[in-house]
């Protein structure tokens, strides 16, 4: 009996060596079977190095016990202690695989397969495995020989002698040898059938890809042809019998279990189709009936057994069809849909443990790689590998996948596949579910070298790699670049000059010669930059062609690329961020404004990357965030000119952000449809530009005051937005209509205060109009009391006196849009409180005031509409245009604002909605006016985006007019429809205006 002290010492040593049940382990060590070696410390050390020391010890005892006699047991134990390579391999297998331990217990002499380890055995291939299976003459002996070969693969794997790729390749080679052995058994059993047919076995899936798992269905396709002049029908029948027998030999369960199922369901028509077809029958099916996924499956087709010549002919015949698959309608969408369907079919209880099929799993990597291969492999034969890791390496070498992304995907795939191998190796069962039992997780973690805290570390590493796969899979697999590339003719994924010229003509480029020069400048050369450009250009050309001016799009792309081409992140952004390339294409070809803004600061391209639907970087920033940025910049600047230069730079960047968001939302992308709510886009642009203008004025005001007076101006000073500015409805080229109000600080002379206030206004105007690369901001104060004849700045008291005594009805109407925007907020709010009684007069407007407003409106229509302008197409002063709608709404505000709080807003659309809610307009009339106002505003925004300068009517230039149409959602050739729709919508609005405003 073991002394307590000794037991305690052994118990502790076992714990230190990783045993989870030291008591049971101690009993096994004390067993008679291990008596000759139990005192040798190398045994305990070797057991402690295994994935599961308890399991390895139990397996060793069973193996020793199973030896035929004492001599055999002594040979095993002596070799175990003397030969470290055997000790590591044997105990490594026993600690990782209960199934292989069972095999060794049934076949106790098979441990000797792990003794010989000559250098040539480090990487055995099909021939070596065929020799290992050569003596197997029946299904049972084939299984035993197969397991013996599997022992050597598993031993090299768990000891780290081979990596994941080599292990998977060896498993595929063993499968190949096994299929050949099984077919030989079948042919031997039916020599007459063998004599009249040629039968080729084509490996598919992971076996075909030379990347098999320990336990996996072996996917195959059979091709049969007559031999020796035999009848084709009889030959196919004979080949079918041989194929069926071969499948049974591998798949059926015997006293030695099974090897793996042979699955022929990837054949034409699946399980409903004939098991064996002739080559011509295969070709006819794929030419006429095959679905997209069937071509994807053929990526991995590889002849492995039977008539290899026939198999190679099969692969060569079908290969062209594989590389034409990307031309099929909806090819990319079909592949993506199939992947999503696989995920959707995973039981909810299993999805978090699905190592293969779940999000971030192995299939995500495989699908992404295969899709990229099918799209780009048409023009690049280097991508045509059936092995995932080899294909990924080739994709990275060709510039189709970022190098860093490829490294991360490779690492993640290797980890997840190795984890899958360890899970399957334990019981030699086909599974992709990560076990939940701690003992299983501990064994897997230790087998992967995670010894400190195996369970926690395994879960952390697994989730980390799955997260990487999910992120990169979404970038690579779902990036909309592929859809467009997949629709190009073969050979155009990377353009040759001749193909480019033909493509340019077909796409309608007005100057193909100039466009080709741009392409040659962008795509020529052997640099990585040029390779990536060649990949992007076919896609971009198609997107440019969707616009009204593809030549401008390509020219602008060249300008941006010349400016940023040496910047590492630029091409990486376009290639890897799904939204960026298409967003850039839309922006560069939609007109002059956005490209002009971008050319002045090309780094703003970074805003076009992925986010919420590809628009996350384009979401306009709020006023508070903008003011914080500009005020901080002013604080850092050395003087007012430098400060305002920085502020104007921010304004330029944010104008680009808003314009790009507007364009992308108006055009839509491959992933995200065009914004259906046109009013929402109008509100977005108006609010964003108004917030930006307010922040610009705030920063400029701060810079001027700091330069001239330090921290404190002698008078409190506020800027009040008017017109579209006060209504949050500014367009891209709008001036800033404002009023300036000041109030002398205590003890400051009024004249001194007035001089300071006027000096501030003059300096703000000067700084915002200094010629520079940034667009100027014009300040217009003509809506002030007495107009251009009145003082530019007034005190609060002066404003109050004027409005009480002299104010005309049009001035009360103008005040409906007054809103504090910059400067002293308390003073600004007091000004708003001051004017409320004038813009929302108690008891509303009298009849005389209503008649005066109507008279003013009629005179404006008659006098201000430009000579020769079409009144049906003028967005501001034309029939049913902006002025019509706004004056109608404002009349209701003047009449009813005093009793209807909802009408007390500076914004047209909310006021219109409030008038409807108050019963002042019917829902139909309100909708008609809203539709016309939104459309007219959209047209004005479009004109500015297209021409780069403001305009109130549709362009006369045909290409510019078409560009406005594309922005509004009208396709090529539908400019006439756009004008007809505009006239129809505004005509209906004018009818409402006549009734509501003029009382007709």
UniProtKB/Swiss-Prot annotation:
Keywords: ATP-binding, Magnesium, Multifunctional enzyme, Nucleotide-binding, Nucleotidyltransferase, Transferase. It comes from the Bacteria. Its EC number is 2.7.7.89, 2.7.7.42. Disulfide bonds: none annotated. One of its GO terms (biological process) is regulation of glutamine family amino acid metabolic process. InterPro entries: GlnE, GlnE_rpt_dom, NT_sf, PII_UdlTrfase/GS_AdlTrfase. The keyword GTP-binding does not apply. Residues 487-1000 are annotated as: Adenylyl transferase. Its cofactor is Mg(2+). Belongs to the GlnE family. Involved in the regulation of glutamine synthetase GlnA, a key enzyme in the process to assimilate ammonia. When cellular nitrogen levels are high, the C-terminal adenylyl transferase (AT) inactivates GlnA by covalent transfer of an adenylyl group from ATP to specific tyrosine residue of GlnA, thus reducing its activity. Conversely, when nitrogen levels are low, the N-terminal adenylyl removase (AR) activates GlnA by removing the adenylyl group by phosphorolysis, increasing its activity. NCBIfam families: PRK14109.1 (NF010707). This is Bifunctional glutamine synthetase adenylyltransferase/adenylyl-removing enzyme.
